[in-house]
Amino acid sequence: MPSGATGDFVLAAPVLATEVEEPGGGTAGAPDPWSSVPVGDSRVCVGCGAQRIDTDGYCEACGLAQPRPRDHQERSLNGVCGVSDRGHRHHRNEDAFAVAATSRPDGSSAVVAVVCDGVSSATRPDDASQAAADSASEALLEALESGVEPETAMTEAIMTAANRVDELADEYEREPSRNAPACTIVSAVVTEGRVTVGWVGDSRAYWFPDDRSGSRRLTVDDSWATRMVEAGLMSEAEAFADPRAHAITGWLGADAIEVEPHTLTFTPDAPGTVLICTDGLWNYAEAAADLAAVVPADARTKPLHAAQTLARYACDRGGHDNVTVALLPVDRVEPHEPTMPNHPPTLVGDSLDSPTIQLREGES
């Protein structure tokens, strides 16, 4: 896919749009940073103090882009939590996430997290990721509450998200040299100690037991490099050194020829934490062992702090991309035989000549 022009990278002051747990399991959302003041000149520039903020969010006096609600977000509900940050190089946050909790018909609890990464070289990637995260989360909750098995619910939720992103192509005028709105997706459900993961694209899921001894990646990227390695056409070093390495071969969007959700279900053999994230995090610690060294030891009991730490880790190492991470603690270990994946599943049957789409602007 042709790459677009790079955006204007403006650093904005930190903004925190957050939801935190209250006693009884509810959440209280912090107000939109602009919602408590009238629209117009009463808004004050965080850089120069002028009260001249235009409708696009820029200061007419110094030109500084003002913080937006999506620049930094944190949410936590019944243990499952997520943190998203714009990073230091992009002018907006094109990642999105959702976290939720519900009950199954038998009374058992279930927690859900969805993370999506908008394709920067497509039209309105921020809207694509938000639409996918919201629609997938809603579909998962509805299915789980109706008694649908998590793996089936996951597949259906990803397809629901795909359809919603498809619809955006008709809602926006496509920008020149850009594809229709598009994004990746990764999602996880934890219920009664059992984990189900689903994904399309290169957003990832990892499993970290409390002792970190069996840490592993649960997903396989839908990417050009992955396909070359799995086909035996290139070594891993050769494939990932190629300029086409990070071109994704699976995504949600009207330009995707076919959406094929991948799913994985397993029962952990020990308490631990499921982590799902965009490449804004894993680009700085790709291997499970490397990422395990960064995940705080108390991630299962303090997941929000752990998510904050991981987002900060990515930003401290350059923040070249938006970064989003969600954590789902797994406290309960079933007494029956655990089922643990030995390695990430392979994409058996996927065509090696599938179309690709560039994730970020400037890639070729």
Model-derived regions, located:
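PP2C/PPM-type serine/threonine phosphatase catalytic domain
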Residues: 1-364
